[in-house]
């Protein structure tokens, strides 16, 4: 089930934190780096799924309104153009990953991008707003 799948990332993140503490105590730098990578992967998997669950709606949702609608129109020209670009990002992910809509805190605008695995290609300074799981299990 999806909750068991999500729980795997939480356990992986917790395990990586424990192993990081042990490796730091031993000053084992190669193990530190490995577990920092494992922590990033699993923590991102947890965060992405948490956002994704909140994005899902039993009623299917509709076009956004208010500030989000205005930001989409400004960034993409219209909701339909946004949807087409988001669809293209989602359906062309190579391997495992996500399609993402995020707020660029540096440029103060919305961006669409692909996330490889859970965290690779995720621009710094981005606040994720909408994530679509494109892993094979989704």
From Swiss-Prot:
Pfam families (UniProt xref): Sod_Fe_C, Sod_Fe_N
Protein name according to UniProt: Superoxide dismutase [Mn]
MF-aspect GO terms: metal ion binding; superoxide dismutase activity
Species the sequence originates in: Mycobacterium marinum
Major enzyme class: oxidoreductase
Cofactor(s), by name: Mn(2+)
Function in brief: Destroys superoxide anion radicals which are normally produced within the cells and which are toxic to biological systems.
Transmembrane segments: none
InterPro entries, A to Z: Fe/Mn_Superoxide_Dismutase, Mn/Fe_SOD, Mn/Fe_SOD_C, Mn/Fe_SOD_N, Mn/Fe_SOD_N_sf, SOD_C_sf
Protein family according to the UniProt entry: Belongs to the iron/manganese superoxide dismutase family.
EC number per UniProt: 1.15.1.1
Binding site for Mn(2+): 1, 49, 133, 137
Catalytic activities: 2 superoxide + 2 H(+) = H2O2 + O2
Cofactor-binding details, from the entry: Binds 1 Mn(2+) ion per subunit.
């Amino acid at each position: 089930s999806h909750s068991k799948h999500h729980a795997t990332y939480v356990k992986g993140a917790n395990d990586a934190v424990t192993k990081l503490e042990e490796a730091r105590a031993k000053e084992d730098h190669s193990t530190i780096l490995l577990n920092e990578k494992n922590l990033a992967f699993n923590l991102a998997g947890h965060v992405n799924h948490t956002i994704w669950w909140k994005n899902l709606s039993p009623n299917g949702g509709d076009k956004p309104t208010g500030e989000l609608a205005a930001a989409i129109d400004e960034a993409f020209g219209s909701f339909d153009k946004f949807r087409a670009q988001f669809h293209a990002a989602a359906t062309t992910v190579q391997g495992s990953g996500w399609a993402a809509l995020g707020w660029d805190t540096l440029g103060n605008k919305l961006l669409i991008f692909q996330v490889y695995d859970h965290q690779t290609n995720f621009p710094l300074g981005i606040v994720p707003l909408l994530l679509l799981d494109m892993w094979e299990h989704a």
